[in-house]
Amino acid sequence: MTTRMLSIAGTSLELIEHGRGRPLLFLHAGEGLMPERPWLDLLSQKYRVIAPWHPGWGNSPLIDGNGTVDDLAYLYLDLADQLGLENAALVGACFGGWVAAELMVRSTARFTQLVLVDPLGVKFGGRDERDIADMHALPRAEYLRRAWADPARGEIDFTKLPDSELAAIVRGREAFALYGWKPYMHNPRLKRWLHRINRPTLLLWGAEDRIVSPAYGEGWRQAIPGARLELIRAAGHFPHWEQPEAFVDRLTAFVEGNR
């Protein structure tokens, strides 16, 4: 595993690369990358995983003027150009799924498959319906109950973390709120453009996700032409962390079956 800093269109970006073979660009969740969890090692056995820390997370500073999800979509298109990616798979989880969808409605040129893992970013319900749980307002215990099939697996003992890690967690949460504060965690215009995604698309969903439910995933399936929705049992909002083997197996079967 290697970590380096890149300059993309004047923005500094911390980038993790792991594995060899066909490129796979992974856009992380609002909780961050968590490269120490098994998902990354498992995925790197199949692909050359390219995993940037979004601006505001890790050691990636915020974009000048703070930036928007639109900026992130264009930033990662520039990253793909700079790295010369060809026939790559694009994977986005949670907040990263929103960014991945925004990227793909703009250009699918460098990517041959799209995998969205419990993405945010779209409102399918009525004005007074909450499609996406208010993660920032929930008490920690309630958030864990909604986000994980087994809440104990998501628990972090903050008292044992060094100050540098605590500061990074706070920065990431501030950035997450910044990008999705209003309107809350979605782009009202994105739904109308999802038909532009003309690559095979898999929606992987934790069967016990109570941040965005599988019914919300069905809305995504209907909005993207030809998309498939598959549920991962015993997983909540982060199936790549909670059930990494099942996540990698499903992803690999889809990507290799749609080359």
Residues covered by each model-derived region:
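Short beta-strand/loop motif that positions the catalytic acidic residue
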Residues: 197, 203-205
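Active-site loop/oxyanion-hole signature of alpha/beta-hydrolase fold enzymes
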Residues: 50-91, 249
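Flexible "cap/lid" loop of the alpha/beta hydrolase fold
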Residues: 101-106, 111-142
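Hydrophobic, aromatic-rich cap/lid helix
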Residues: 163-192, 196
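Gly/Ala-rich beta-loop-alpha elbow adjacent to hydrolase catalytic centers
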Residues: 92, 96, 100
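Conserved HGGG/HGGXW glycine-rich cap/lid loop of the alpha/beta-hydrolase fold
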Residues: 9-61
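Catalytic active-site module of serine/aspartate enzymes centered on a nucleophile-bearing elbow/loop
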Residues: 227-259
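Acidic catalytic loop of the alpha/beta-hydrolase fold
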Residues: 208-212
